[in-house]
Design a protein with these regions (language model features):
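Short, charged/polar, Gly/Pro-enriched secondary-structure boundary elements
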Residues: 46-50, 59, 107-110, 176-179, ...
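N-terminal beta-strand motif that seeds the catalytic metal site of vicinal oxygen chelate
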Residues: 1-16, 62-65, 115-146, 198-201, ...
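Structured core of small recognition/catalytic domains
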Residues: 146-231, 235-251, 256, 260
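Short, conserved charged micro-motifs
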Residues: 17-19, 73-77, 208-213
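Vicinal oxygen chelate
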Residues: 80-131, 216-266
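Exposed loop/turn and edge beta-strand positions of beta-sandwich/beta-sheet ligand-binding modules
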Residues: 4, 36, 61, 96, ...
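Core segments of cupin and vicinal oxygen chelate
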Residues: 2-49, 139-185
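Residue-level structural signal for beta-strand termini and adjacent loop
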Residues: 36, 54, 115, 166, ...
Length: 266
């Protein structure tokens, strides 16, 4: 199995501006065939990011992630073998990445795409270049972290990484790490509890200091590029401390919508 964790979606009330943020700060490239009324689709040469308008009844922020596999039908069979109560649903052909949507044992939703199927659109058909700032990890905070970790290892062949100093689980496709964090209500003693689900995304960069300088430059060029403040007030301080427990990041920020992002150098 050669599964790749190469898709993430963000729902945003300011989807166009948020897309420009990732393009400007992290150098992500937009699709050569944009559909601006529907979403902003960007890529880093490996991972594709869809910034989609928040629809009625939906929350903003990280929405789902996606995995590319060699054979979708075989993968669906593996999912059923792992747990017969799990299932998948076929997606409309207009979707640029997904052939199916499915879920893990904790109902965390992910999309499935088949490699070289010809169904990929936008950057998912173009994602093949090298750039200095790339998505390094996608973090998921969920109730039954160990079982979900086993699910992604057994079904997709993601490689467990040995990090014995914390309670998290780390699985790699060889480039991107899926980080699975145990969700505990006690982690939210000094703040409003967050739902289970996607927690944050991380980038590998050539220089953290340069990212900080670029952020200042962007705000000077366009005041709408100002991101959310972190660590203010007692609850903000508690949220930041919990975020900073991720060992894969060194500098912490948000996008325009408030999605948590951490960055670290190669």
């Amino acid at each position: 199995m050669s599964a790749r964790v190469n898709h993430v979606a963000i729902a945003s009330d300011q989807y166009a501006l948020n897309g420009r943020f990732y393009e400007s700060l992290f150098g992500m490239k937009p699709s050569s065939k944009p559909r601006p009324a529907r979403s902003v689709v960007l890529g880093d040469g490996y991972v594709g990011m869809n910034v989609i308008p928040r629809r009625d009844g939906r929350t903003s922020g990280l929405d789902h992630f996606g995995i590319e596999v060699e054979d979708v039908e075989d993968t669906i069979a593996r999912i059923a073998k792992f747990d017969s109560s799990l299932s998948a649903v076929k997606r409309p052909p207009i979707r640029p990445f997904a052939a199916y949507s499915a879920h893990d044992p904790d109902t965390n939703i992910f999309d499935l795409s088949q490699k070289s199927s010809g169904a990929q659109k936008d950057v998912y058909a173009e994602n093949d270049w090298v750039q200095p700032r790339t998505i390094s990890h996608i973090a998921l905070r969920t109730r039954h972290a160990e079982r979900c970790s086993q699910f992604y290892a057994d079904v997709f062949g993601l490689t467990p990484l040995n990090r014995p100093k914390d309670s998290n689980f780390y699985l790699s496709d060889g480039r991107v790490t899926l980080m699975i964090i145990p969700w505990k209500i006690t982690d939210y003693y000094a703040q409003d509890p967050a739902r289970t689900g996607l927690d944050h995304i991380g980038f590998k960069v050539e220089s953290v200091d340069q990212v900080k300088k670029d952020m200042e430059f962007l705000i000077g060029e366009n005041p709408h590029m100002r991101t959310r403040a972190l660590g203010y007030g007692s609850e903000g301080e508690a949220r930041l401390k919990l975020f900073q427990k991720c060992p894969l990041g060194r500098f912490h920020l948000t996008d325009i919508e408030g999605v948590h992002i951490d960055v670290a150098e190669e």
